[in-house]
Amino acid sequence: MDQKNGSSFTGFILLGFSDRPQLELVLFVVLLIFYIFTLLGNKTIIVLSHLDPHLHTPMYFFFSNLSFLDLCYTTGIVPQLLVNLRGADKSISYGGCVVQLYISLGLGSTECVLLGVMVFDRYAAVCRPLHYTVVMHPCLYVLMASTSWVIGFANSLLQTVLILLLTLCGRNKLEHFLCEVPPLLKLACVDTTMNESELFFVSVIILLVPVALIIFSYSQIVRAVMRIKLATGQRKVFGTCGSHLTVVSLFYGTAIYAYLQPGNNYSQDQGKFISLFYTIITPMINPLIYTLRNKDVKGALKKVLWKNYDSR
């Protein structure tokens, strides 16, 4: 990212929500609470999945991966955002912006792929219960999770390098609360059609392919559940599927809005509010929806708490 006159940027100013000073205080309090709950919820899942042998299953392996991912994702964004919301200095160094772009995009892309991979585990458990242990072999689910991380950070590396190659017009004010590809493209003083086309193509793969897999898998799960005679069993599965789909829709829907629309239609003002959903809100909701309401997790939590209490 070089200026048109050949000199290099020393940093950027993250304008964020500075045009709404009254909103900044409200956002600071709300986002701080969200961040605390995100830390507590996701750390709980990781610790319980490690400590309780009953949770050493493919499903909880994926859940602990998702929790670790969300923990890193929010920690790479929220502290900087909180400082900017309450401080006068809203700048971020050039290096800091590059690192934030690479890490946040890598983790976000990984989550897109991982959520698509995770639904295969649910599909195998509901639609192929007799073959589940054979299908979800440890080598397979470790490979699936690892592939998600590799794809996510490979995409991030590509996008970061392409952004670094852009020539900027001397403007260093970013209409966002973090360094993200769409607002950075707005600072370029060269034609970004190729960048936007490449970003659109890759985003289709990263976003829409997992969405298609999720829709297909859940349609098969619904068909399998409809064969269950017990109404209580149907209600339980439909309730779980419904809550999962709600979170998935929120995450993918907002990410699709940010990355799969033409650059000339992209509203930076709307974009930063939309980004709050997939960067902060869904990482907080994920542990509540996927695991903390689960009977196995509640049982594991009680065991750990009682064990600590008895040891005193």
From Swiss-Prot:
Q: Which residues cross the membrane?
A: 26-49, 58-79, 101-120, 140-158, 196-219, 237-259, 273-292
Q: Which UniProt keywords apply?
A: Cell membrane, Disulfide bond, G-protein coupled receptor, Glycoprotein, Membrane, Olfaction, Receptor, Sensory transduction, Transducer, Transmembrane, Transmembrane helix
> What GO biological process, any one, is recorded here?
detection of chemical stimulus involved in sensory perception of smell
Source organism's superkingdom? Eukaryota
Q: What is its main location?
A: membrane
Q: What does the protein in this record do? A: Odorant receptor.
Where are the glycosylation sites? 5, 195, 265
Family the entry assigns? Belongs to the G-protein coupled receptor 1 family.
Q: Which organism is it from?
A: Homo sapiens
Q: Which residues lie on this side of the membrane: Cytoplasmic?
A: 50-57, 121-139, 220-236, 293-312
The record gives the membrane topology as: Multi-pass membrane protein
Q: Fetch the SUPFAM superfamilies from UniProt.
A: Family A G protein-coupled receptor-like
**Where is the organism placed in the taxonomic lineage, from the top?**
Eukaryota, Metazoa, Chordata, Craniata, Vertebrata
Residues in the Extracellular compartment per record: 1-25, 80-100, 159-195, 260-272
Q: Which gene encodes it?
A: OR2B8
For this protein, the record's InterPro entries field holds: GPCR_Rhodpsn (IPR000276), GPCR_Rhodpsn_7TM (IPR017452), Olfact_rcpt (IPR000725)
One GO cellular component assignment for this chain's record is:
plasma membrane
Compartments where located: Cell membrane
One of the entry's Gene Ontology molecular-function terms is: G protein-coupled receptor activity
From the Swiss-Prot or TrEMBL record, give the protein name.
Answer: Olfactory receptor 2B8
| Disulfide bonding pattern of the chain | 97-189
